[in-house]
C-alpha cells in the first residue's frame, strides 16, 4: 500500500470522495476524528459503508481505525465492523506484539460468528503513540500472521511526552519523533511487514509533502498515510518505482540469475552483492503492487 487515506466514519461525502481518490487504501476512522457522543452512530455508518464498498470493482483496500483498547470502546467497534468484512483494522496506541495477539483473538472470535475465514481481516498497528510503545517496537515479529504493517504517529506521543512541539521551524520532526520513526521502521523490518510513514498535517504544502515522502522512501518505508485526497497523487508518485529504477533492478536480478551460486556480480564495472539483489527484488515487487507491467 503506497497511500492510505484517513476519512471520518461519519462523513459520507468524504468517504465517497476517498473511494475515487486513487488511494491504495481508505482508513475509515472511528478514533480521533469522532467525538465521544458520536461513536455509536459512526460505528453503524462505518459498517454500512464498508458492507457496500467491499463489493465495488477495482476498489482500494478498506481499513477501519478502531479505538484503542484502553478506551473500552474497541470491542463495540469490532462487533459493528467485522461482519461488514473490512480488509484490515488499524490498531491505535498499540504497545507491542502482545496487543496484536490480543486483537488477533478478538478478530478470530468475531470472524467465526460472522462466518468469515479465520485470518480474513488483517492488522496494521500504530506502534509509537505511547512512551511504553517505543520500548516494544521489536516485539511484533511473530505476533500474528494477520499483521501486515506498522505505522507511527507523533501527535499522541508528543502529548504524552509533554512536548511543546514535534517539528522544527522547517517542518522536520524533532529528535524524539525521529527516534519513533526509526523504531517503527526497524520494527516493521524485523516483523517482515510493511513500514508506513505517518501523515503530513500541512496538506496544502505539496513541496513539503514530497520532500517528506521522498525521505520516507529513501529510508525504507513502503507507503505513507494521508489526511486529504490532494496528498494521494504525490504519495503514489513517490512510492511508484520509476522506469529507470525498474530497469536497474531488472538488470541486477538478471545478473544474479545468470550467475547462480555467486555472492557478487559485476554490471558495467560496478560490483553488486546479495543485499543489492534483495533491494532489486523489493523494487520490482513494489512496481508490481503499483500496477506496473514489468
Where are the predicted features?
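Expand to "…catalyze enediolate/carbanion chemistry for C-C bond making/breaking, isomerization
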Residues: 1-294
